[in-house]
Amino acid sequence: MDNLLPQSRFSYFKKYPIHAIRKYLSMLRNQKEEEQVARFQKIPNAENETMIPVLTSKKASELPVSEVASILQADLQNGLNKCEVSHRRAFHGWNEFDISEDEPLWKKYISQFKNPLIMLLLASAVISVLMHQFDDAVSITVAILIVVTVAFVQEYRSEKSLEELSKLMPPECHCVREGKLEHTLARDLVPGDTVCLSVGDRVPADLRLFEAVDLSVDESSLTGETTPCSKVTAPQPAATNGDLASRSNIAFMGTLVRCGKAKGIVIGTGENSEFGEVFKMMQAEEAPKTPLQKSMDLLGKQLSFYSFGIIGIIMLVGWLLGKDILEMFTISVSLAVAAIPEGLPIVVTVTLALGVMRMVKKRAIVKKLPIVETLGCCNVICSDKTGTLTKNEMTVTHIFTSDGLRAEVTGVGYNPFGEVIVDGDVVHGFYNPSVSRIVEAGCVCNDAVIRNNTLMGKPTEGALIALAMKMGLDGLQQDYIRKAEYPFSSEQKWMAVKCVHRTQQDRPEICFMKGAYEQVIKYCTTYHSKGQTLTLTQQQRDLYQQEKAQMGSAGLRVLALASGPELGQLTFLGLVGIIDPPRTGVKEAVTTLIASGVSIKMITGDSQETAVAIASRLGLYSKTSQSVSGEEIDAMDVQQLSQIVPKVAVFYRASPRHKMKIIKSLQKNGSVVAMTGDGVNDAVALKAADIGVAMGQTGTDVCKEAADMILVDDDFQTIMSAIEEGKGIYNNIKNFVRFQLSTSIAALTLISLATLMNFPNPLNAMQILWINIIMDGPPAQSLGVEPVDKDVIRKPPRNWKDSILTKNLILKILVSSIIIVCGTLFVFWRELRDNVITPRDTTMTFTCFVFFDMFNALSSRSQTKSVFEIGLCSNKMFCYAVLGSIMGQLLVIYFPPLQKVFQTESLSILDLLFLLGLTSSVCIVAEIIKKVERSREKIQKPVSSTSSSFLEV
């Protein structure tokens, strides 16, 4: 019978078609699900019942775990069932960031044409086509397409910051559901889920912890705190959990478990987490327009205004003189189109692109072209402390032994490079027992490991291992066998281990302890002094307390160390001072920047003592400086903060929201703000600042994507080079504007005067086209690659409100234009004495204007320095461009086929020498003006040095 049973079952199913079997199985599955629903009455009906709320981390930290579980209707041990999870997900959504679909790429491309200068050029191109000036139309269109495409590519590349946030969410996690531990996707989590954490895990959502064993979480990417936070499960009083760093019973999404294990209940997912707050701020924040973009917009509007003004004036005068109105309109529009510098956008783009290439050589990646120039008018740098001004590598710098010896420790980071120096002598191994006992205790009572200069474990423990490596004692960790361990907790604030030496296992066990001085000293009854063990007196306790206070006031994190046979009978060994040290070269860069008129402010999540100590070491903080906390910022309105923010050097306990508020206040005061940072907590501020600067090595992906510039080797000094580059680029753009506008105005005036005064036209159409090519061609373009003046870093940042067309620049443009017009008209009048226009007349006039152009370009290479001071051949591209233009002009004059096209004839050597002498006047006058200006500056310098400028923020 048993043998027949399987066959009979198979025979039973054989009677029915396959679709009937499927229907039967589906019915059983539905019945099972209905039973589950009946069993779990907590499942709310989507239409009739209230959905599970989302708790804020602040509220959840104040409540007992049982109350949190009750509010979230969760079972801490068994977790949620799958039906409940599905229903909650339908309401709360996936545990991910919803990056909304942006407008199509073609719309983004079209939006680039909204620039006033681009719109003006478009109008010029259309008019050129209507007037059959196809050469102009093609050149203008090509210029527009190049500029618009470059701007589009830069903008597209910069819009990745929101997508990068999702990378900090772990793809998978361990979650308890229906009483079973599951390996599930982090995006599947919902409020009320139970999550298990262990070493190396990245927290998948905001969790209210209900179990924690020696749990330590690295929150530096979110809060800026260097030291991993020890976590507990007890409720937190409302008065003590104001900032994220103080919520010790919450594990935040995106942070990293450094030590221990824990369980927590999900209180916030996706955008409802603290990480989500950063995401929403980034989504709402728009990158501000750069000063150069504002200047270009203003210049475009000014040129539009002047162009329409010219059209109106010429038409009015022509009408008053009785000329044909349509003919006058045609002439005036042609002149206005010719006067518009279509080469300006290309020169700006090329100049910025070359600046970006030079910055790459200096180990800085600039993601947005205009940002290079913006650095030139930056007058405030807000810098994150951790990882930017400091290395984010905890390092022991001071040792104080129980018998009063003080040792200094050199070297930085988790490596053996450095020395321990006592009274000028280098200490190594067991040469100094007082020091070596401290190092031994710190090395043995330690769970950290350093491999290939990379730390695995807590930063403070890594600092102690690095200290042992410097003394050649790091092998002590393997010399002892650990028998018992008393893990660190935030309540007891110490860690201890009970060990025996591998070679002396028959001897009594020895305890090693490290931790907060106030706690360790309670377990000590004796202290070491010059090889002897003496009873610990109150006088000695006071001495150690005083030394600990001094180290703390210097911004050091102080650890006490002890050893002995039992926890209650320990011998006090001494103190070590640990700090996250400043980066090499930062102090020098800070000094140079401050001297050049740039104010630097430190913004950090660290404590006031640590922040002020580091700022003092870097020269950012003095006795007269102020420091403000994040809580104080919250208590101020925008007006109050705007008044106080220029006077503050250090902002401590600052969250991403505080950083945003600080930057907005500075910008409201008219400052151009650069923000440096490396963590997720910096991303929003980096995007809001005029210039966001991220660290390349230590920076998170989110931070790098939100930034405008990335320092490849994390060198703060590179910012100084970038500012120098920015100032130089702006000078080059001004040089180009001066040259092109002076030449354009001269050509415009020359033809306008001839038209309005019924003179014969001094230049024919082909000659005007050739001049237009030179105006926008190689000589003009080469001004954009003029080497950066090394003196520029000493100049104060320019006011971003200033137009490119300053009064001084307009004066120089007009002077050059007047000289060119007068000189060219003089030649034309001189050749026209016979009252008959011949090819020689136009050739002399044409060549005169071209030579004026070359000398005008030469004088435009610098607004302040003499041509001989900067070097005639320092800009090789300029030399080649001018030489090429002159060769082209000579071909036009002497090459027969071109003579027919341009209606020219050969000139004598004396003619050329006469023209060279006359046209050099524009350069000579410009050099005289520079000399007068420099002399005036020297006289005014003592007066101006005593007055404050707009830069002092």
Swiss-Prot record:
Mg(2+) binds at D678, D682. SUPFAM superfamilies: Calcium ATPase, transduction domain A, Calcium ATPase, transmembrane domain M, HAD-like. Residues 1-104, 158-296, 347-733, 785-804, 863-875, 931-953 are cytoplasmic. GO terms for molecular function: ATP binding; ATP hydrolysis activity; calcium ion binding; manganese ion binding; P-type calcium transporter activity; P-type manganese transporter activity. Its main location: Golgi. GO terms for cellular component: cis-Golgi network membrane; endoplasmic reticulum; Golgi apparatus; Golgi cisterna membrane; Golgi membrane; plasma membrane; trans-Golgi network. InterPro entries: ATPase_P-typ_cation-transptr_C (IPR006068), ATPase_P-typ_cation-transptr_N (IPR004014), ATPase_P-typ_cyto_dom_N (IPR023299), ATPase_P-typ_P_site (IPR018303), ATPase_P-typ_TM_dom_sf (IPR023298), ATPase_P-typ_transduc_dom_A_sf (IPR008250), HAD-like_sf (IPR036412), HAD_sf (IPR023214). SMART domains: Cation_ATPase_N. GO terms for biological process: actin cytoskeleton organization; calcium ion transmembrane transport; calcium ion transport; calcium-dependent cell-cell adhesion via plasma membrane cell adhesion molecules; epidermis development; Golgi calcium ion homeostasis; Golgi calcium ion transport; intracellular calcium ion homeostasis. It is a multi-pass membrane protein. The chain crosses the membrane at residues 105-125, 139-157, 297-316, 329-346, 734-753, 764-784, 805-824, 843-862, 876-894, 910-930. The active site is at D384. Residues 126-138, 317-328, 754-763, 825-842, 895-909 are lumenal. Its EC number is 7.2.2.10. Keywords: ATP-binding, Calcium, Calcium transport, Golgi apparatus, Ion transport, Magnesium, Membrane, Metal-binding, Nucleotide-binding, Translocase, Transmembrane, Transmembrane helix, Transport. It is found in: Golgi apparatus, trans-Golgi network membrane; Golgi apparatus, Golgi stack membrane. It catalyses: Ca(2+)(in) + ATP + H2O = Ca(2+)(out) + ADP + phosphate + H(+); Mn(2+)(in) + ATP + H2O = Mn(2+)(out) + ADP + phosphate + H(+). It holds the Pfam family Cation_ATPase_N. Ca(2+) binds at V337, A338, I340, E342, N772, D776. It is an enzyme of class 7 (translocase). Monomer. Homodimer. ATP-driven pump that supplies the Golgi apparatus with Ca(2+) and Mn(2+) ions, both essential cofactors for processing and trafficking of newly synthesized proteins in the secretory pathway. Within a catalytic cycle, acquires Ca(2+) or Mn(2+) ions on the cytoplasmic side of the membrane and delivers them to the lumenal side. The transfer of ions across the membrane is coupled to ATP hydrolysis and is associated with a transient phosphorylation that shifts the pump conformation from inward-facing to outward-facing state. Belongs to the cation transport ATPase (P-type) (TC 3.A.3) family. Type IIA subfamily. This is Calcium-transporting ATPase type 2C member 1. It comes from Bos taurus. The lineage of its organism: Eukaryota, Metazoa, Chordata, Craniata, Vertebrata. The gene is ATP2C1.
